[in-house]
Amino acid sequence: MGTVQWRSGNFELKFDGLYSRIEIDEDQLQNWFNGLAFSTFSGNTNPYTTPGSSYTIVDGDVVAGTLANSNLQVDHVVSHYNEVKSLTAGGLNAKWSGDVWTLGSDLSFSQAKRDNTWQAVRFGSNPDTVSFDFRRSVTPTISTSSDTPEYGIAGQTEPQALRDKIAALALNASRAVDAGPFTSLEFGARVARREKENRRFLSNQSGYDQPISAYQDLIYPVTMPDLNVSTLTGGNMAEIARIGFGGFDPSTLDEQLLDHWNVKEDVREAFAKAVFSSQLFGTDVTGNVGVRLVNTKTTSDGFDSVGSTIQPSTGSKEYTDALPSATLNFLIDDQRILRFAVAKVIARPPLDELRTGRRLDDPSVTVGQLTGSGGNPQLDPFKATQVDVSYEWYFHTEALAALAVYRKEVDSSIGYRTDREVINGLDYLVSAPFNGGGGYINGVELTFQTPFYFIPHMENFGVYSNYSLVDSNLKEFSPEDNPLPLSGLARKTGTFDLWYSTGTFEARVGYKYHSPYTVVYGWNAARLARLQSEGTVDLSLNWQYSKQLGFRFQASNLTNEPLRAYTDNKPNRLANQDDGGYQVFGRRYQLEATYKF
């Protein structure tokens, strides 16, 4: 990251650039348990009723059990995952300031890349007994009567590439005026283009017909002392693949055309704003009133399939929104401010959800109801009108007590559901992102921070705290009989920090809490989960050695709080790995050094 700034008289020019690269390269050992809920393996359609089996039901769900003689299949997976993410960003900002006019421009560009490959070999086994306990109040456990792979083998390679870039140009101007309460007029325009594309490939390779003994010298058992799970299988994946099916062969990779898509978004906008300063009821008042016009056009290219027939497809959407806004700030005195704000806002749909490309049943083959799935290039943005009111009391240096309340009247939301559509004259049930109806989001937020100036010799110590409460009637579309609350809205969140600061040295220990909330944990927005409440403790130490050189040490999750997610809006239904599941991240430590030229 770097910044270059040049100034001459009233003109200022600044360039900043950023490049970052993160690589994840890890061996992954996994056991996949197939059919715990319902199995058809070896003709066994209900493993819970076999002789010797037992189970526990809570709220209609099987949450624990011992399955005997059920012949369930366990996949022993030896895998490797590599992911390289990079970000390149740059901006050129120019500003000229005169006595009356101020002119500015901003040219920016950024590009994010992600290349990831998951590669694996799989063995199988059919243990006589599988025992598990996934109840919400306990650490999940699962064990088998035998942990040894019994047969094999299959291989899988799944590369994926994602590209996301945006370029934008903004021009703005302001003019000082003396027209009653108005002090300045501001206006400007911005154009931007964003483009996102995805590519995915897949290879499945079958193993030779040979006994498990052919791999005995290449695999070994791995136990996880901190997790109550059955023994995992480790091994030399490349050598296992060579013996099992001749090695991983890149020529076997097939393009997954239905996961190949490209979405472009062009945004043109202009704004005008009047800034004012006056008095009302004997109180100084500042604020502004303005409007922003936004035109958005999206185009999407991809592929559709009807059965096994794949063909190119395109989609487009264009819409224009007028977004007025106004703010009022009542400067009650030197310590107290009352703020009001009202605005109409939009949030454009994620580009991933605007992808074209549908998987549709072939009516010449499918018997019964036709189904399909895919993206939706016709999505409208999330729209809302919001009102904010806050009261701030700055009762001492670096001390604040504040109360803020807000309400958002939502006109249109976005979520995944299954809708009935007529396609080529035929009735389909299509699962895709759709626009939903409106609702409200109400919230209140309390903030309190202060140094301990009122305690002798404790003025370098202080506290920061924040608590927010959210209420909303907005729901996701699934599960249909008990929809999840809108994604990202935690009813309760809180932060409490104790700090110490001398100017050159600062220490902070903090506690953060959130109540359960809905998340999209992975890359597929159709797969919703509910993240259980969490409370974490973090530590941060900062030492500014000189004007140029500084050091920072951070320790996160000192209490080793696990992550637990559940599905279907039922806390006892533990989510699978891709949707959060149960994960122990451990404590994380980070040491940084910064030098300013």
Task: Show where each model-derived region lies.
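Outer-membrane beta-barrel signature, preferentially recognizing the C-terminal barrel domain
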Residues: 79, 83-87, 259-265, 346-402, ...
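Transmembrane beta-strands of outer-membrane beta-barrel pores
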Residues: 8-10, 19-23, 98, 109-115, ...
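Gram-negative outer-membrane beta-barrel transporters
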Residues: 405-410, 417-421, 426-520
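C-terminal beta-signal and adjacent terminal beta-strands/loops
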Residues: 514-520, 542-597
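Transmembrane beta-barrel wall of Gram-negative outer-membrane proteins
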Residues: 1-65, 85-92, 99, 324-326
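Flexible glycine-rich, low-complexity coil/linker segments exposed to the extracellular/periplasmic environment
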Residues: 44-72, 131-154, 201-259, 369-374, ...
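Surface-exposed extracellular loop regions of Gram-negative outer-membrane beta-barrel proteins
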Residues: 195-197, 222, 232-235, 239-243, ...
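Short loop/turn motifs that connect adjacent beta-strands in outer-membrane beta-barrel proteins
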Residues: 9-10, 95, 100-104, 176-185, ...
